[in-house]
């Protein structure tokens, strides 16, 4: 396996190095080919590496900075005034080809703005999109984009999102023909606003895409499609609502299994199965949103992620780097546009 270098914003997220460093060490043990460049405050990072075995330590490089993009910083402020922040320096490592991917749990808006300026979008892509996967009833993930990077989108942008989401599903899940759908207020062709209607027409003209038409909100988790496309306003609300409902269900299930002697006894007997179900419903199991459409790989972790969830985001970044996702998107979009124009 060819060595792969990942740039990490070690200071990002609610917990900074207390989570990012231990999770990174787990990743280094999991992926023998992985090297990491941790960007952040050396005084906070080095104590967490003091007892590390030499073979792992040799695969870690530190880039020192004390500047951090705050969660309350506006994207424009972060772009103009945080030139030495851990987030920006990590993205610069991807731009300068010193790392194949970047991961941050920091400010999403700032990550989007800095990444777009430093890395630029791929040819034929107007705007990058934020995409993540959700669980479905058939145990395979469904990819949803955009998740908030673009609150308003024209039909052409939605079409580009569909192409990028399809390629991502092909690359990560090795699905040769992902089914792509547009999230809408109904499945009938006459439903939806002009942007969604026109995007549907563009997708119907693209034989290389496995377009499945419109999909409603109650069908998101059915597993009937693999990629669901919408603007960032709808996508962000959908994602946050899904996470809230999932946490409610997990809470209610755990509470219900502690009420009564026989229920507690039954819960102990079927604990492995219960834990499996809870893990499938836990949003942390799907941590890691990809900022796709750029000339480099950028993955966003939840700011509140624990070690396990942050490791999940690292694994996603590794997979995308191995598959050379930006190159795949660029080549596929070029081929699709040639088909349409001919």
Curated annotation (Swiss-Prot):
Compartments where found: Cytoplasm
Keyword Lipid metabolism found: yes
Enzyme Commission number(s) of this protein: 2.3.1.274
Keyword rRNA-binding tagged: no
Pfam family, one: FA_synthesis
Coarse class of the protein's main subcellular location: cytoplasm
Pathway the protein takes part in: Lipid metabolism; phospholipid metabolism
Annotated keywords: Cytoplasm, Lipid biosynthesis, Lipid metabolism, Phospholipid biosynthesis, Phospholipid metabolism, Transferase
Entries under InterPro entries matching the protein: FA_synthesis, Phospholipid_synth_PlsX-like
Signal sequence range: none
SUPFAM superfamilies referenced in this protein's UniProt entry, alphabetically: Isocitrate/Isopropylmalate dehydrogenase-like
UniProt GO MF annotations: phosphate:acyl-[acyl carrier protein] acyltransferase activity
Gene Ontology biological process terms, A to Z: fatty acid biosynthetic process; phospholipid biosynthetic process
GO CC, one annotated term: cytoplasm
Stretches assigned to coiled coil: none
Catalytic activity: a fatty acyl-[ACP] + phosphate = an acyl phosphate + holo-[ACP]
Domain of life: Bacteria
Similarity remark: Belongs to the PlsX family.
Assembly and oligomerization: Homodimer. Probably interacts with PlsY.
Function according to Swiss-Prot or TrEMBL: Catalyzes the reversible formation of acyl-phosphate (acyl-PO(4)) from acyl-[acyl-carrier-protein] (acyl-ACP). This enzyme utilizes acyl-ACP as fatty acyl donor, but not acyl-CoA.
Protein name as catalogued: Phosphate acyltransferase
Annotated organism of origin: Shewanella loihica (strain ATCC BAA-1088 / PV-4)
Gene name for this UniProt entry: plsX
């Amino acid at each position: 396996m060819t060595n792969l270098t990942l740039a990490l914003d070690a200071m990002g997220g609610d917990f900074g190095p207390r989570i990012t460093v231990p999770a990174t060490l787990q990743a280094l043990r999991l992926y023998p080919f992985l090297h990491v460049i941790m960007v952040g405050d050396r005084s906070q990072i080095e104590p967490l590496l003091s007892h590390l075995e030499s073979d792992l330590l040799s695969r870690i490089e530190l880039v020192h900075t004390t500047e951090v993009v705050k969660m309350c910083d506006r994207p424009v402020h972060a772009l103009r005034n945080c030139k030495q922040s851990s987030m920006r320096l990590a993205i610069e490592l991807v731009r300068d080809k010193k790392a194949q991917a970047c991961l941050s749990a920091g400010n999403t808006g700032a990550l989007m703005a800095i990444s777009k300026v430093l890395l630029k979008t791929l040819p034929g892509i107007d705007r990058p999109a934020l995409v993540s996967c959700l669980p479905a009833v058939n145990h395979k993930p469904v990819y949803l984009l955009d998740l908030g990077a673009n609150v308003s989108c024209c039909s052409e942008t939605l079409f580009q999102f569909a192409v990028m989401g399809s390629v991502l599903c092909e690359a990560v899940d090795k699905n040769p023909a992902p089914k792509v759908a547009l999230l809408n207020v109904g499945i009938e062709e006459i439903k939806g606003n002009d942007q969604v209607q026109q995007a549907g027409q563009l997708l119907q003209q693209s034989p290389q895409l496995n377009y499945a038409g419109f999909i409603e909100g109650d069908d998101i988790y059915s597993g009937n499609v693999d990629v669901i496309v919408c603007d960032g306003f709808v996508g962000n609300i959908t994602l946050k609502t899904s996470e809230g409902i999932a946490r409610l269900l997990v809470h209610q299930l755990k509470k219900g299994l502690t009420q009564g002697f026989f229920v507690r006894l039954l819960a102990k007997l079927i604990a492995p199965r219960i834990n499996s179900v809870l893990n499938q419903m836990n949003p942390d199991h799907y941590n890691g949103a990809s900022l796709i459409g750029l000339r480099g790989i950028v993955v966003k972790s939840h700011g509140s992620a624990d070690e396990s969830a942050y490791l999940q985001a690292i694994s996603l970044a590794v997979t995308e780097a191995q598959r050379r996702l930006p190159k795949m998107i660029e080549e596929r979009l070029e081929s699709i546009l040639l088909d349409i124009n001919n």
